Amino acid sequence: MKSIKNFYNEDGWKNTSNNSKDAELFEDLRPSAKKYVSKCRLRILNHIPKNGGSNILDFASGPIQYNEYLKFSKNFKKRHCVDFSKIAIDKAKKKLGSKGKYYCKDFLKINFKKNYFDCVVSLHTIYHIHKSKQAITIKKLIDISKKDSPIIIVYSNPNTFINYIKKVFFIKRHIKKDKLYFFCHKNNWWQQFS
């Protein structure tokens, strides 16, 4: 199993003819799905404060690879991008410039102020963190967010039938060496944070 850090530093964010290795492996890039996938990405905006604020945290920002993702920070003064891939951070800098603040390191090793962020976004990230560190990560996200500010986490439901089907197709479509760490807690695990 390849480490997440190695995958994204070596291959994941490299440009391909279509998009990126990450997108080719894990996203639906069919032309027929383009409009639907774009709408899914934009649904995140429904949870981001319309009046924005000073700081939004993009945890595991990647290169901010889609235009829809740029809209997340349009009403914020600064977008703080955290990712341990230098390739991702360099690409994010090209897109955001001085509107961003960039951290190329392990999130748990960054000392953010408590109650600092007006909004937090984490897309498809938490389940790639070792299961023993997922709760610590969520608690830190809560700690550094302002009271009553949204923490938007896109996770995976381990109990859906579609996950079983996806596993079959994933095994058929991809070489095993590209398999990345993935662990989803049961839905009731999330209750500890309410």
Task: Give residue ranges: language-model regions.
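Conserved beta-strand/loop positions that form the S-adenosyl-L-methionine
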Residues: 59
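A conserved beta-strand element that flanks and buttresses the S-adenosyl-L-methionine
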Residues: 121
